[in-house]
């Protein structure tokens, strides 16, 4: 899942080298923390949150196969 988020996020941002992705695994839940550069947060979120919502939808579809729940958090540095 971490790789999927990383690929999607790097395609959206101007500074892919400053992008950090962290995965925190629980028993049924997987939390993925995404830390973009300050100037790239708007690009990750997108207009009216469309980009981040699309990323969450894809993650939930992939997680359903694994019978897990995924939470994508965008963290402002």
What do these predicted regions represent?
Residues 1-43, 51-77:
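RNA-contacting regions in translation and RNA-metabolism proteins
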């Amino acid at each position: 899942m971490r790789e999927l988020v990383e690929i999607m996020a790097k395609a959206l941002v101007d500074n892919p080298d400053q992008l950090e992705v962290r995965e925190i695994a629980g028993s049924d839940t997987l939390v993925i923390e995404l830390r973009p550069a300050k100037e790239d947060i708007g690009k990750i979120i997108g207009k009216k949150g469309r980009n981040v919502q699309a990323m969450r939808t894809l993650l939930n579809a992939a997680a359903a196969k694994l019978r897990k729940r995924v939470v994508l958090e965008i963290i402002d540095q």
